[in-house]
Amino acid sequence: LQSDLQPKYEAIDTDWAFLNLRSVPGMYRSIQELGEIFDREDQAQKLVDEFTEFYDDYKKKNEGKDHPKVMILMGLPGSYIIATPNSYVGSLVELAGGENVYSDTDQEFLTVNTEDMKTKEPDIILRAAHALPDQVVEMFNKDFAENDIWQHFDAVKNGRVYDLTYEYFGMSATFKYPQALEELQPILYPESDEDSAKAKETSDNAQKKAKDSDATEKYNEQQSK
């Protein structure tokens, strides 16, 4: 998007700025830049300090723990792609202490076949939805039930496949990241049966919320206007 728009903005000789919403730290760097542009540096720094304090406390939860290997599937209607650490969802998992099995790239998303995914052997598979979450969750359920290769993944065998709440795990950074990190905590670092049960309950609730979103119906209504 930036590569397309930047030459146009430069051509009309106007003030412009692009926000980095691919990660939480990127969002706060953008906030600092906006504070400088609009002479609101104190307010911007206050937000940055709040994030720094929050994240310093959050990191202490998982100090010294082994980082689980995680694969993130970003679902689209009819297909899915791999989310890398350069995407917002990937950055959240990284902030939470997960090790993304597709980290050796500068791309946000990758198209990869399941055979290659199997070679990565993730401990955990996370499923997120971008656009029409009601369709995406049904697609994931169907594919994992009917595509035999999934049954050979350790994450599937061990019951460590989780759906993520679509409002928290989208394409762009938002101030809902604390809720996202809280959701990831029992998924990535279950320390008790209670944590494991909470992770499954959260995943089930994410599925239900996606199914109840009526996103497809709302989209079709908009298209018909």
Whereabouts are the PLM-identified features?
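Short, solvent-exposed loop/turn elements at domain surfaces
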Residues: 78-83, 127, 134-135, 170-173
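Small-molecule-sensing regulatory modules
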Residues: 94, 112-115, 168, 182
